[in-house]
Design a protein with these regions (language model features):
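HotDog/MaoC-like acyl-thioester-processing domains
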Residues: 1-15, 95-148
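Residues that form or immediately flank small-molecule/cofactor binding pockets and catalytic motifs
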Residues: 21, 92, 110
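Hydrophobic residues in beta-strands and at strand termini
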Residues: 23, 89, 138-140
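Hot-dog-fold acyl-thioester-processing enzymes
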Residues: 1-81, 143-148
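Mid-chain, well-packed structural core segment of small domains
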Residues: 74-95
Length: 148
C-alpha cells in the first residue's frame, strides 16, 4: 500500500503511479457473472469473431471503469476520495493483453477549503492505443488540517 498522498505533494503535469491489468478470458467471465452481463461477444469466440466481426471476445467496457476506480483509489489513499469519473470507449480490450492504466494531473485547486485534483486518464493496450480515455476529479487531504 502506498503512503498517503496530500494535495500539497502533487503538481500539475505530474503522472500518477500506473497500474497494469492483464485481461484474461477468466477475469472477463468472472466480471460478467458479477454484473449479470450476458452479451455473447464477451465470452463466445465463434459468435464474437464470425457473427460480429470482432478480433476476439472483448472485455466489457465498464470493466475499464473499474480499473480506473482501482487505480485512483489506490493513488488517493484512505483519506482521499474519487469525486467524478468520466470515460469514453474507443477501442476493444481483448484477452491476453496487458493494459497500462495511468493518469496525469491537469489542474489542482482549492474549493471550500478542500483540495481537488483533475486528471486525464488512459488505459493503453500493447500497441500504445488509449482504449478508454477518461477524466477524473479527486479530493486529496490537505496537510495540517483535520479531516472529517
Amino acid at each position: 500500500m502506498q503512503d498517503q498522498i496530500f494535495f500539497e505533494d502533487v503538481i500539475e503535469g505530474q503522472e500518477i503511479t500506473s497500474l497494469e491489468k492483464k485481461v484474461t478470458t477468466v477475469n472477463i467471465l468472472m466480471y460478467l457473472s458479477t454484473v449479470w452481463l450476458l452479451d455473447r461477444i464477451h465470452f463466445d469466440y465463434p459468435f464474437a469473431t464470425q457473427r460480429r466481426g470482432l478480433p476476439n471476445v472483448v472485455a466489457p467496457g465498464n470493466m475499464a471503469g473499474d480499473y480506473y476506480v482501482e487505480l485512483l483509489n489506490g493513488w488517493v489513499g484512505e483519506k482521499g476520495d474519487l469525486r467524478k469519473l468520466a470515460i469514453q470507449f474507443r477501442s476493444f480490450m481483448v484477452p491476453d493483453e496487458i493494459l497500462v492504466c495511468g493518469g496525469k494531473i491537469t489542474k489542482k485547486y482549492i474549493d471550500a477549503d478542500k483540495g481537488y485534483v483533475e486528471l486525464d486518464l488512459w488505459i493503453k493496450n500493447p500497441d500504445n492505443i488509449n482504449c478508454v480515455p477518461g477524466k477524473a476529479v479527486v479530493e486529496l487531504p490537505r496537510k495540517g488540517r483535520k479531516e472529517a
